[in-house]
């Protein structure tokens, strides 16, 4: 099982469900990660954590990795795929989100992928083109991670010291990589839409405070956070992957308890639509993205069901509507939600593991 921080919620949900079932007690689970130290707490007699191996590593490590792949009954991944070595191994790609941005030139399913989870039939031709995987290999059962959106972890809002009436989470797409240059060059030293300097950040913080909003920004895992970390504001705060780890929750546990989402070109929007809560988009660099990376979908669909934020005044109006309970785009969001999500019941993990259990019982 491939487990990487920031894109591991589907795999973790499946692992937890499997460990609870007697039918999986005969299997050993090997978690492969570039950051194994983050997963040591999961180890027991049935679960082992090992370091991801790459070409150029020691021969001993490469032989060990090859041996594990040869012995695997099933390979389960959702980001950095692990190619199988034995023809009777079942390779399932759980996906880490339905594509908004075009990824055809940067990310594809490996040819040995036997099955891929598709969020809904709507996505099948899109996944086929973007990920270069045949439609007949796609299975629609729902994303396991989305079950957490329906969970009842009522204590999550006690994770912050600030007092607030509404909690809004902001998921911006990365624009400034820690190592490489940004995919889309930005004039913002903060690398977040509409927050181009400290003054802009303070203005949005003031508006959030005015309406009793706690605005929590979750930057992309690979984004350069060096300047953002220096901000010390009371109603515009930043959280990182370690926030979820240290509090023993997943990103989707947290998402389910928020009151609204702000994002841009992230696939998280299609998951969040399941909550029925308001969504806003910050897309000031839309034309750049469209020209340089392109989109996997017709972006008009997202514009039609989301509030567009271009100025601080737009933030103020969005906050005001949220506090006053005005939701003019509710019906349109539901329409898009039903198009892009087949399952709305919070039982996707069970469905996926039931299906995997049946796969493993087939003659191979």
What spans do the regions from the language model cover?
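Donor nucleotide-activated moiety binding/catalytic core segment of transferases
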Residues: 56-68, 72, 222-267
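C-terminal alpha-helical cap of glycosyltransferases
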Residues: 345-364
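A nucleotide-sugar donor-handling region in carbohydrate enzymes
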Residues: 100-104, 111-195, 221-222, 324, ...
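Active-site and donor-binding regions of nucleotide-sugar-utilizing enzymes
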Residues: 1-150
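Catalytic binding pocket for nucleotide-activated donors in carbohydrate/polymer assembly enzymes
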Residues: 232-234, 267-340
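Short acidic-hydrophobic, aromatic-tinged amphipathic segments that line or gate anion-handling sites
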Residues: 51-57, 237-246, 304-318
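A donor-sugar binding/catalytic signature common to diverse glycosyltransferases
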Residues: 74-95, 99, 247-293
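Catalytic donor nucleotide-activated moiety binding site of glycosyltransferases and closely related
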Residues: 29-47, 170, 201-244
């Amino acid at each position: 099982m491939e487990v990487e921080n920031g894109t591991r919620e589907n795999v973790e949900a499946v692992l937890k469900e499997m460990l609870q079932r007697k039918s999986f007690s005969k299997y050993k689970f090997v978690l492969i990660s570039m950051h194994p130290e983050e997963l040591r707490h999961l180890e027991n007699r049935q679960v082992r954590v090992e370091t991801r191996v790459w070409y150029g590593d020691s021969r001993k490590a490469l032989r060990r990795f090859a041996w594990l792949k040869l012995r695997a009954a099933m390979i389960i991944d959702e980001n950095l795929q692990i190619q199988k070595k034995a023809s009777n191994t079942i390779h399932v790609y759980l996906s880490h989100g339905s594509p908004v941005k075009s990824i055809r030139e940067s990310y594809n399913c490996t040819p040995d992928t036997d099955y891929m989870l598709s969020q809904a039939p709507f996505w099948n031709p899109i996944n086929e083109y973007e990920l270069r995987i045949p439609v007949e290999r796609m299975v629609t059962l729902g994303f396991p991670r989305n079950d957490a959106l329906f969970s009842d972890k009522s204590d999550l809002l006690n994770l912050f010291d600030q007092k607030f009436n509404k909690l809004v989470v902001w998921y911006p797409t990365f624009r400034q990589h820690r190592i490489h240059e940004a995919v889309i060059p930005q004039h913002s030293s903060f690398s977040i839409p509409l927050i181009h300097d400290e003054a802009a950040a303070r203005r949005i913080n003031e508006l959030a405070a005015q309406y009793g909003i706690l605005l929590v920004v979750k930057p992309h895992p690979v984004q350069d956070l060096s300047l953002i970390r220096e901000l010390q504001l009371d109603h515009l705060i930043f959280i990182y992957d370690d926030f979820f780890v240290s509090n023993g929750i997943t990103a989707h546990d947290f998402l389910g308890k928020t009151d609204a989402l702000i994002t841009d070109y992230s696939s998280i929007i299609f998951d969040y639509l399941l909550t029925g809560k308001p969504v806003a988009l910050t897309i000031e660099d839309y034309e750049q993205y469209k020209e340089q990376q392109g989109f996997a979908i017709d972006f008009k669909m997202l514009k039609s069901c989301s509030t567009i934020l271009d100025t601080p005044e737009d933030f103020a109006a969005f906050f005001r509507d949220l506090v006053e309970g005005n939701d003019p785009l509710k019906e349109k969001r539901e329409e898009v939600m039903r198009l892009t999500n087949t399952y709305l019941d919070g039982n996707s993990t069970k469905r996926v593991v039931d299906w995997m259990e049946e796969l493993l019982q087939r003659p191979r």
